[in-house]
């Protein structure tokens, strides 16, 4: 780089960085042009095009756009899209048909063919699909009428299985809501027909199947009175037992068996409580 002294002639009013510069008190600088207004030239300015400020370019190019000339008006586009109701119906129908096809298509080719036919039909006639779909709902209330055969088959098998698998009454204990006197009377009749020494184990019927006696459930009133008596005395004497049987319309044997079962239940509860408290020393 050339020395500054060789390029610029040093004048009396020139400032040199290496020299101390003193300004006299009476110097007048009003005639000199300002530094900001003085034109400055650069050696590389002719090689580059004139660049405008970014803000001006943005405003001129985007704020003054002729929308009608640059972007053509598309209008309502009736040829591309149908009405909103048809679009929603078509999407829902295609999703529903796809789900049904996944459900039935693996095991039944006829179901898959029916689902495809129904799907294709609704896509070709989208204008009438919105009215026909809601009017042609099948028996199940969800799927169209094409799936009534599967609905009938499924529920027919369910009804048949329930009828064939239904218990006969002597294998599984039943509990039907009825009044306490009727239950007690039926139990009393059963007890009267049975011998006293009959065991509670199931018996073998004539055809070789194991049968069981009809279970006589106790009513809430009977259980409440029996629990009250059990609270006062765990073991009941014969006199009190006969009195309870007459008051609750039960047999003497029923009252005796209930007290036996209740004592076993109480013993089990006490054993469980003892085990619980011994396993938790903090209690």
From Swiss-Prot:
InterPro entries listed in its UniProt record: DUF3528 (IPR021918), HD (IPR001356), HD_metazoa (IPR020479), Homeobox_CS (IPR017970), Homeodomain-like_sf (IPR009057)
Disordered: annotated span: 160-214
Any GO CC annotation of this UniProt entry: nucleoplasm
Top-rank lineage group of the source organism: Eukaryota
GO terms for MF: DNA-binding transcription factor activity, RNA polymerase II-specific; RNA polymerase II cis-regulatory region sequence-specific DNA binding
Record keywords: Developmental protein, DNA-binding, Homeobox, Nucleus, Transcription, Transcription regulation
Subcellular location per the Swiss-Prot or TrEMBL entry: Nucleus
Ranges in coiled-coil conformation: none
SUPFAM superfamilies, per the entry: Homeodomain-like
Function: Sequence-specific transcription factor which is part of a developmental regulatory system that provides cells with specific positional identities on the anterior-posterior axis.
UniProt name for this protein: Homeobox protein Hox-A11a
Origin species: Takifugu rubripes (Japanese pufferfish)
Gene that produces this protein: hoxa11a
